[in-house]
């Protein structure tokens, strides 16, 4: 089994030709082997292409989300996670780059931290956003120099190529697969561009990390990562990324245009408000678990009598669990089998778990 599954979501359109180019570059550059598998997940595309054959010819995994009517990064990530063979996941956007040297460091940290077994262990990666000039200038150098070139530009603040720095990439996290699935992955109510990664990251931090001190006014948004006060959710999000900085591990985000094709950018404000709503209720905000691929579509009825249960961890592997008290199917102290059968058909139940006391 591979140590790491890297999930790369993408969707093509004529307005964004660079996406196809970057998918091809990644499929050629990365090598799937016994330590790492690369999973390219295509969401909605409005442009025809032959990338499936190209990706598979380079010995990577290709998946297609046939249900998407509009492109969703979150849905692509969720599908990739369900199908991943490794117990550890990393999500990498098609615009982002990690060097092979840094992948080697990540693989070593995965083993040292035992992320495959420790569901609360994380690696949060910092990201350097590059300007338009960097897209062409970097290609004049051998890729083995890219890490040093970009980091030097960042550290001495030349900003020849660096647009800005974020201490945490909220979308590129190394996480235990079971934990990701039991937390429900990306909330698919976020439509189009923005904030599904913030929403997930907040739930991950709540579940996996205990902080001695939390920022004041968590709902405050500094709107950038250049803050000087421990205030707002960005200061909370930034805390874990510095560890990877000390190891010299960075993600580089290449510049791209942002056309609003297929209304992809249109819902950003709505997504922003949905994120704030969830953030204000962070202690209670919860999603149903996702399932591994072989359990997708399974619906399990958990019938109990005196005690309700929470089988989130089991749900990941057996299917979506619906909890019902057996008394709901009684009338005048008599079990009405027709009520139970109607419920099974209506909810399309495929399995039943019974409380031992029934």
Feature-to-residue mapping (PLM):
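N-proximal low-complexity "stem/linker" segments adjacent to membrane-targeting elements
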Residues: 1-25
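Acidic donor-binding segment of Leloir-type glycosyltransferases
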Residues: 23-66
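Glycine-rich, basic loop-to-helix element that forms the pyrophosphate-binding segment
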Residues: 66-84
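Short aromatic/hydrophobic "clamp" motif used to bind/position activated sugar donors
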Residues: 89
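Acidic donor-binding/catalytic loop of UDP-sugar-dependent glycosyltransferases
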Residues: 96-109
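Short beta-strand-to-loop element that shapes/binds the nucleotide-sugar donor at the catalytic cleft/hinge
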Residues: 118-140
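Short, flexible, basic/aromatic active-site loop/helix in glycosyltransferases
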Residues: 142-165
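C-terminal catalytic/acceptor-binding lobe
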Residues: 192, 196-313
């Amino acid at each position: 089994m591979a140590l790491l599954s890297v999930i790369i979501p993408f969707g093509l359109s004529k307005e964004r030709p660079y996406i196809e180019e970057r998918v091809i570059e990644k499929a050629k550059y990365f090598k799937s082997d016994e330590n790492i598998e690369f999973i390219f997940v295509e969401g909605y595309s409005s442009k025809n292409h032959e990338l499936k054959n190209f990706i598979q010819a380079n010995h990577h995994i290709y998946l297609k989300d046939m249900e998407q009517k509009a492109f969703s990064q979150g849905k692509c990530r969720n599908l990739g996670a369900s199908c991943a063979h490794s117990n550890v996941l990393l999500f990498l956007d098609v615009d982002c780059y990690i060097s092979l040297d840094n992948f080697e460091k990540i693989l070593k940290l995965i083993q040292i931290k035992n992320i495959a077994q420790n569901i609360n262990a994380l690696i949060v990666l910092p990201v350097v956003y590059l300007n338009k000039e960097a897209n062409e200038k970097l290609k004049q150098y051998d890729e083995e120099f890219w890490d040093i070139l970009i980091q030097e530009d960042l550290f001495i603040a030349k900003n020849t190529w660096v647009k800005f720095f974020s201490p945490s990439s909220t979308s590129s996290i190394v996480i235990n697969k079971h934990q990701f699935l039991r937390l429900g992955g990306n909330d698919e109510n976020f439509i189009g561009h923005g904030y599904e990664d913030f929403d997930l990251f907040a739930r991950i931090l709540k579940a996996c990390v205990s902080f001695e001190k939390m920022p004041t006014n968590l709902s405050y948004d500094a709107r950038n990562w250049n803050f000087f006060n421990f205030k707002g959710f960005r200061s909370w999000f930034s805390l874990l990324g510095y560890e990877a900085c000390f190891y010299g591990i960075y993600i580089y985000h290449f510049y791209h245009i942002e056309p609003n094709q297929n209304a992809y950018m249109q819902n950003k404000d709505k997504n922003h408000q949905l994120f704030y709503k969830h953030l204000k209720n962070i202690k209670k905000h919860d999603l149903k678990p996702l399932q591994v691929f072989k359990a997708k579509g399974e619906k399990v009825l958990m019938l109990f009598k005196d005690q309700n249960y929470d089988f989130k961890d089991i749900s990941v592997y057996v299917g979506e669990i619906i909890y019902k008290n057996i008394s709901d199917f009684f009338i005048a102290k008599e079990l009405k089998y027709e009520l139970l059968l109607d419920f099974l058909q209506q909810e399309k139940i495929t399995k039943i778990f019974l409380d031992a006391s029934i």
